[in-house]
Every structure is written in C-alpha cells, then in structure tokens.
Swiss-Prot record:
Function: Potent inhibitor of Nav1.2/SCN2A voltage-gated sodium channels (IC(50)=0.6-0.7 nM). Also weakly inhibits Nav1.1/SCN1A, Nav1.4/SCN4A, Nav1.5/SCN5A, Nav1.7/SCN9A and Nav1.8/SCN10A (IC(50)=20-610 nM). It acts by shifting the voltage dependence of channel activation to more depolarized potentials and by blocking the inward component of the sodium current. It shows low affinity for lipid bilayers. In vivo, this toxin causes general ataxia, lack of response to stimuli, and semiparalysis. After a few minutes, the mice are unable to stand, and breathing is reduced in rhythm and intensity.
Disulfide bridge positions per record: 2-17, 9-23, 16-30
Record comment regarding domains: The presence of a 'disulfide through disulfide knot' structurally defines this protein as a knottin.
Name of the molecule in the record: Beta-theraphotoxin-Ps1a
Location of this chain's protein in the cell: Secreted
Native species: Paraphysa scrofa
Length: 34
C-alpha cells in the first residue's frame, strides 16, 4: 500500500503514491511533486 496526499511519511523510506506524490523532508507528509 502507498500513502495518500497529506499522510504522514518518512522521507528516508518514502512510501507515498508514485509518481504523483513525494515525501516532504521538511513537513514529513506526502505532497504532490511540482
């Protein structure tokens, strides 16, 4: 399973839904890639 938008995540083990989402190192949640 992958993590949805604004879900808490770990930047060193990014499980956010690809390819749209990426784990923000600053905020520690899944954000849309710009």
């Amino acid at each position: 399973d992958c993590l949805g938008f604004l879900w808490k995540c770990n930047p060193s083990n990014d499980k956010c839904c690809r390819p749209n989402l990426v784990c923000s190192r600053k905020d520690k949640w899944c954000k849309y890639q710009i």
